[in-house]
């Protein structure tokens, strides 16, 4: 998949019910089973969609989506270089363009990811400003996410990197 020129600028996107999605326009709008008991911190692949978990119930977050022809730098290196707090990545089967939108699919970026060829891809989600303690705590802050998608021939296990300076790191489950 050569780079197709579709790099979403860093934009504000509306989030509802703590979720933003990267999904085909015709995908089912179901939430992951239970975010508060899952070991995923910021992202989960559900079928053809990536569900991004925000700390903001209803409001705006910052997000950017990058479609690449090759894999980016290693996860830990990317986390440190960009000042990100947490990063997760896993495989996704992409068969049609993906749109970045809020849970209801009403607003966002159409065709944020357009694969040259359908098939196995890797998706990496990085977050800043994502407080990970009490899920019911109401905090005023800005969240920022970066989503990177690239093709891959080989399935890989889900991966996670966490900034060791974050005070909540001891309370997080292992990937």
PLM features: what roles do these ranges have?
Residues 1-80, 132-175:
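Primarily secretory-pathway and cell-envelope proteins
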Residues 76-117:
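Extended, solvent-exposed segments with strong compositional bias
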Residues 94-110, 123, 159-175:
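Unusually extended, aromatic-enriched hydrophobic runs near protein termini
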Residues 109-110, 130-132:
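Short beta-turn/strand-loop junction motif enriched in small, turn-promoting residues
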Residues 117-131, 143:
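Internal, hydrophobic beta-strand segments that form the core of beta-sheet-rich folds
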């Amino acid at each position: 998949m050569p780079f197709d020129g579709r790099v979403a600028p860093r934009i504000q996107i509306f989030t509802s019910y703590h979720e933003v999605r990267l999904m085909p326009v015709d995908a089912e709008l179901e939430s992951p089973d239970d975010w508060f008991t899952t070991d995923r911190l910021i992202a989960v692949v559900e079928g053809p969609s990536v569900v991004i978990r925000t700390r903001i119930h209803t409001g705006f977050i910052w997000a950017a989506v990058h479609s690449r022809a090759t894999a980016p730098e290693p996860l830990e290196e990317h986390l440190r270089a960009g000042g990100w707090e947490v990063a997760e990545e896993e495989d996704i089967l992409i068969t049609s363009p993906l749109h970045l939108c809020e849970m209801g699919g009403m607003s966002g970026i159409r065709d944020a990811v357009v694969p040259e060829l359908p098939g196995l891809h890797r998706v990496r989600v990085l977050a800043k400003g994502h407080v990970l303690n009490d899920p019911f705590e109401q905090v005023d802050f800005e969240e920022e996410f970066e989503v990177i998608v690239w093709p891959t021939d080989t399935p890989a296990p889900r991966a996670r990197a966490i900034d060791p300076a974050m005070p909540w790191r001891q309370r997080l489950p292992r990937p």
